[in-house]
């Protein structure tokens, strides 16, 4: 399993008067078992870059490959890629939307085709892994503290058992 970017550039508002270049000819390869940190100043393109890893953003030019396959090719399974490349956003609490913690964390596994029972089991394992107490499972995530919300959001991605986990300053 590998993730590879070749000469990836990205422009916000391409072709408009507000065109802003965010990435310029980025080359990067991440292989199984590697830990990679991307550092830079605010506004340097870190979040934009990682959104290319699972196809949330499409390169203006260049190519992104997952396991040797170009993710921009017709017929490439982007939905499957998003299950394999889990992304926890910079403000993970903005990822929460369900009426209870357990339902929120079950969302990903259910969308991967798990039964309700399987999804609940995966959700409980992920919540325990990040230290969310069982008495919070039926609470609305919006009543939790900021730190608890972040843990729940991270659990939601971990419950999908991604091959690659991307953390954008969670």
Which positions does each model-derived feature cover?
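Conserved catalytic motifs of ABC-family nucleotide-binding domains
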Residues: 161
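The feature captures the beta-strand-to-loop junction immediately N-terminal to the Walker
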Residues: 39-41
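Conserved ABC ATPase signature
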Residues: 140-144, 148
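Conserved ABC ATPase "signature" region
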Residues: 117-135
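Hydrophobic anchor residue at the start of the ABC signature
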Residues: 154
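Conserved ABC transporter NBD signature motif
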Residues: 62-73, 81
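Helix-to-loop junction immediately C-terminal to a conserved catalytic motif
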Residues: 54
């Amino acid at each position: 399993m590998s993730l590879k970017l070749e000469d990836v550039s990205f422009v916000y508002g391409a072709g408009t008067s507000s065109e802003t270049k965010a990435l310029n000819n980025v080359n990067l390869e991440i292989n199984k078992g590697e830990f990679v940190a991307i550092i830079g100043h605010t506004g340097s393109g870190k979040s934009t870059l990682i959104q290319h890893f699972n196809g949330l953003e499409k390169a203006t030019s260049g190519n992104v490959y997952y396991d040797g396959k170009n993710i921009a090719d017709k017929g490439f399974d982007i939905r499957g890629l998003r299950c394999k490349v889990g992304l926890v956003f910079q403000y993970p609490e903005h990822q929460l939307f369900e009426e209870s913690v357990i339902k929120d964390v079950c969302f990903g596994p259910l969308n991967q085709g798990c039964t309700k029972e399987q999804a609940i089991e995966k959700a409980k394992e992920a919540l325990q892994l990040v230290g969310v107490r069982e008495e919070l499972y039926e609470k609305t995530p919006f009543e939790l503290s900021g730190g608890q919300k972040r843990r729940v959001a991270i659990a939601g991605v971990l419950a999908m058992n991604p091959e690659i986990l991307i953390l954008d300053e969670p």
